[in-house]
Amino acid sequence: MNTYKNSLNHFLNLVDCLEKIPNVGKKSAFKIAYHLGLENPYLALKITHALENALENLKTCTSCNALSESEVCEICSDESRQNSQLCMVLHPRDVFILEDLKDFLGRYYVLNSIEEVDFNALEKRLIEENIKEIIFAFPPTLANDSLMLYIEDKLQHFHLTFTKIAQGVPTGVNFENIDSVSLSRAFNSRIKA
């Protein structure tokens, strides 16, 4: 016997796909699919077009690993930014969050993972841009503390100042879950790592 759901394969496939997005549960995925499929198909087409364009044009900056639509991102190519400070973050989305604060006028370096770090390229960048301070903007965890120590050890011969954003960012919490006032206060109160 066929069930009602068996006749809605395409719709249910859309719900399943939407449910794979972080922080979107089954109920939210159903509501989004229903809205896009029945209530606002024009928006669905706009989203489809925006996704195609993003997938076609999105890449990572060859200098800092942040998201970009060109080989070098706007931040790295901006001559007015302070060259003496390099803010290290874990993920490209962290650059968005910190840029929204408008507290940091230097440049960034996105780690993604320690295995992917090209220390030769990073060292070249430290010299070329005359970096004097590395700011670790990582959520406070024991693993991230170890990561900071590892990076400090690898770059100690540059005699840099290493700082980290101040505590006040709760341990184990990602930036997207912190209010902007707390994150701004923590960033402006950074301390020597």
Swiss-Prot record:
CDD domains: TOPRIM_recR. GO terms for biological process: DNA recombination; DNA repair. PROSITE patterns: RECR, TOPRIM. A zinc finger (C4-type) spans 61-76. It comes from the Bacteria. GO terms for molecular function: DNA binding; zinc ion binding. Keywords: DNA damage, DNA recombination, DNA repair, Metal-binding, Zinc, Zinc-finger. Residues 84-170 form the Toprim domain. May play a role in DNA repair. It seems to be involved in an RecBC-independent recombinational process of DNA repair. It may act with RecF and RecO. Belongs to the RecR family. This is Recombination protein RecR. It comes from Helicobacter pylori (strain HPAG1).
